[in-house]
Amino acid sequence: MGAGGRRMPVPPARLLLLPLLPCLLLLAPGTRGAPGCPVPIRGCKCSGERPKGLSGGAHNPARRRVVCGGGDLPEPPDPGLLPNGTITLLLSNNKITGLRNGSFLGLSLLEKLDLRSNVISTVQPGAFLGLGELKRLDLSNNRIGCLTSETFQGLPRLLRLNISGNIYSSLQPGVFDELPALKIVDFGTEFLTCDCRLRWLLPWARNHSLQLSERTLCAYPSALHAHALSSLQESQLRCEGALELHTHYLIPSLRQVVFQGDRLPFQCSASYLGNDTRIHWYHNGAPMESDEQAGIVLAENLIHDCTFITSELTLSHIGVWASGEWECSVSTVQGNTSKKVEIVVLETSASYCPAERVTNNRGDFRWPRTLAGITAYQSCLQYPFTSVPLSGGAPGTRASRRCDRAGRWEPGDYSHCLYTNDITRVLYTFVLMPINASNALTLAHQLRVYTAEAASFSDMMDVVYVAQMIQKFLGYVDQIKELVEVMVDMASNLMLVDEHLLWLAQREDKACSGIVGALERIGGAALSPHAQHISVNSRNVALEAYLIKPHSYVGLTCTAFQRREVGVSGAQPSSVGQDAPVEPEPLADQQLRFRCTTGRPNISLSSFHIKNSVALASIQLPPSLFSTLPAALAPPVPPDCTLQLLVFRNGRLFRSHGNNTSRPGAAGPGKRRGVATPVIFAGTSGCGVGNLTEPVAVSLRHWAEGADPMAAWWNQDGPGGWSSEGCRLRYSQPNVSSLYCQHLGNVAVLMELNAFPREAGGSGAGLHPVVYPCTALLLLCLFSTIITYILNHSSIHVSRKGWHMLLNLCFHMAMTSAVFVGGVTLTNYQMVCQAVGITLHYSSLSSLLWMGVKARVLHKELSWRAPPLEEGEAAPPGPRPMLRFYLIAGGIPLIICGITAAVNIHNYRDHSPYCWLVWRPSLGAFYIPVALILPITWIYFLCAGLHLRSHVAQNPKQGNRISLEPGEELRGSTRLRSSGVLLNDSGSLLATVSAGVGTPAPPEDGDGVYSPGVQLGALMTTHFLYLAMWACGALAVSQRWLPRVVCSCLYGVAASALGLFVFTHHCARRRDVRASWRACCPPASPSASHVPARALPTATEDGSPVLGEGPASLKSSPSGSSGRAPPPPCKLTNLQVAQSQVCEASVAARGDGEPEPTGSRGSLAPRHHNNLHHGRRVHKSRAKGHRAGETGGKSRLKALRAGTSPGAPELLSSESGSLHNSPSDSYPGSSRNSPGDGLPLEGEPMLTPSEGSDTSAAPIAETGRPGQRRSASRDNLKGSGSALERESKRRSYPLNTTSLNGAPKGGKYEDASVTGAEAIAGGSMKTGLWKSETTV
């Protein structure tokens, strides 16, 4: 550039080389590396470093950057080997273990030192001397545990410090005092404990403008975990609560099984929190010290890196004594914590404890076979849906049980497990809850709700926990007066608990004594000048308390009474306590009350002046009660004193936890001395009462019978018990005892009891006397009916289905009544009472279901419609099994009872005076099922009645024949309606009297005696009588005296009416039953064997009966003598006989299946047949009908021809040649009836064979051949159609009779017996000559 300011142009190529100039200088041979960077340091690189604040230009040759990272340096490099101008020294990711004093002396220009990610554990004081220009120091991710103020000496200009990731848990105060320029620090670690030891740091940081890094997070305690230290307040940094150590372990940590003579070392390490941290060793709770002779070597505590403390214990020669728990305990000023390990020392011959199952209130535990000396563990049963978040039920808790050296199980420890009973778990929750004045009343009301069901308590801990809560509430009575009433109610409810549970609770925790003691102290705690009187009433406890002045006291008489039961105005006082039932929630008028008057009036328990009330106990306190005050307690002005009275209905709460007579049954088998009267208490508080100059007079009413009465007072010293010292009996009557006592306290009369004391109307009390004879009559009638129908099964004309239903119904009604009378009051025995409740539950439901099933079957029969049978159509389906009825009427109650008992067997014992379901479970297990069964049954009754009514409306002429008297059968036009088909489509005669009117009988076996209307009326009567009996019986055991008597009488009426009706209807009024009874009696004379014959329904091939003469006796003479029978009293035409045959057609062959719906309505006439119980065999024979049809048809044609021939007297046929029923085709069972079958039914005339009649009661020739029991072929049907039509037009025919066995001709009866030889030879019957008679 010249003087004129000219500028030389720069070539473009030079401009491109300017940016590359620094790189070229570094790559030049003379400039690579910095001069003075020594070669001997392996892994170190040196480079120039641009000063901060310079954006361009060359590096300052005096500033050096040395990088020695990622190598294996065991210590920092010698500063003498580093360049003098080293500004940055990076030593990260090496293996440096410590920093010695003056490790960096000489690097005075060093500004940044990076020592992160090494294994530095010690930093000696003065390690950073000579680094006066150092501004950034990084010691993170090392193993530094000790940091003091000397550690950072020589760093006056340090601005940023990072010591995070080390192993220290706290910082000592003043550790940063040598860093005056420090602005940012990061010291977060995984062990950092933010407690009172770091409280100094927050104000120090504020005063020195120190910024704590946001990455400095607390690790302990757990409440401050992951919280930034900079965001905490000083008040949050405190050393309170449980001690939490970041490190605490014991080696070995698991149970060790060793042998005698082995060597076993222990090592315990924990966090070191300061000079007060110590480690101690314990064996089975006993402190251990070093003892070389015993083989115990205990080393001194060692401290590592100011962070850990370690102690070692060595057992050099293990003996049996070393078995048990070894404990390492860490003690600090803040608290103690410990770790345990179990050691089991085995002997040379070790035994085993056997496998065992233990069931208790904590669950079901199965302990396996365990080696002797070993402690076994079982996981507790957890309840994931429980609402009790208790530490004892936390997941992972276990029960433990030790097997001792002898191979015997020790008692287990189940305290960490939850209770299995819901009520016990809830009561345990109440015990754990903190109580204060703000929530005491609320908790008391909630607890009272649970004690209302105290009668169902099943665990002694229920009583223990309630007693503990009552004692806790006592401390708040002076602030909350309402607690008095709640506490008395809870104590009253607990008196309903089972006596054995009360005794167990007393033995476990003196629970009963605690309850009584709390009640005795209520008056002194609750009374004040503002509340000078308290009166509380409850079912079993009454309390009265007064605040009185001793100088104005003139005596006090108090009487405990209760309202007389409704309707017992004339009852004797002795009945009180015996008739009143134990009720969990009694009525208000049955509560105990006090009535007190001043002075000493003469009050008698027998003549209590309050209307409709009964006095139970009275006490008279003498006027000199306070005259014996000690001089120290007699100030010039007499103080106020508390006088309190209590009365307990019985002595249930007075239990001794010792082994004396207070335990049930301890005095001998069946007898013991127990409390036989109420217990009354009188006591003072706030003023001392010395020896009484006058005794206290007490009168008590007996509620239990016994002998040898004794006056006693309750002594709470020691185990507690009744003592007669100071009390004497004045007199004792059967109902009332009077006594004197020199003590203030609980007083009662003890007696030798013949049974355990029980509450009024208690367990085991009998029913009203009228119940027993009426129930006996009912059982006699029911079992007579059952036995009759079982022994005469084949001779009673009822269907198979009806037979099963009747027997089951009678049996279950008998079971209900018998169990009710015999066991409903047996509440003394828990298992028996539960069995009675289950049986009553089952039998009651089953009886109702059998009635419903019977109503359904009757409705099906009435609504049955006959199916139209086309030619070639298959026969109706076979009978359905009876098992379905048993599954409904017996299976459903069994399932309900099984589920109810499986859920909780105590659902069948409510501590009520009767054995039945608890109220709440009974709603779903009994009353709801009954509410479903009854409407369904009544609907079936209604539908059946409507079908009967519609039939009467459609057939007004037969309306008066629907409901018949017993033994009466439908005849006339009713027979015409059911006489449509005489023979079925397998080849039998289809003799149709009136086409379009006749329909076949329904495929159900009906009653051969009663019409459907009569059956329906009988079933409804039985149903409602049973309901009335059940309801009256239930009221008879649950009501009070007068309603109980009324209901007992009504029960007796209903039971007697039910039994008599069932027996009369099903046995006494049936001719077939009466005939079977007469058959059981021997004949009075030889002539008694000749019984008049009657027309019997004999089965055809298709199961339809026709009228024929029944055998007079099965013992008729086998000879073939001819005789003439006397003429019958009336004559019947063949048409009438045919009509009678069809009307009484049997439906046994149709089976027992349910009726199928069809298009036409069936006949309502009763269907009479000879042996309805063989219908299954007849039904099976249908399958062979086609194979034997031809043979059967030919035999019938022969019979027709022979019947018209005068030379064929052996065959019976009509004059027109029609064949009603061949003898060979009659059902074989028709000849096997009892003699009673030969009698005519009630209301039915005796019939004899008409001309052309082929009916016979003789057995067929070949009863075993199915071909002989088949219908005629359809060819035979065509051949005999015209003859049948002519026969139907006849009005009457003469009936020829024959005398058998020499009987005079023209007699009134005939003997139609045929010998078996004749039946086998000819298969026909003998008959007389035909007589002609005018025909219209």
From Swiss-Prot:
Residues 1084-1095, 1110-1124 have a biased composition (Low complexity). The modification Phosphoserine is found at S1104. Residues 1-33 form the signal peptide. Glycosylated. The keyword Phosphoprotein applies. Glycans are attached at N84, N101, N162, N275, N602, N691, N735. A motif (PDZ-binding) lies at residues 1333-1336. A motif (RGD) lies at residues 362-364. Disulfide bonds join C268-C328, C727-C741. It is found in: Cell membrane; Cell projection, Filopodium. Pfam families: 7tm_2 (PF00002), GPS (PF01825), LRR_8 (PF13855). This is Adhesion G protein-coupled receptor A2. It comes from Mus musculus (Mouse). The gene is Adgra2.
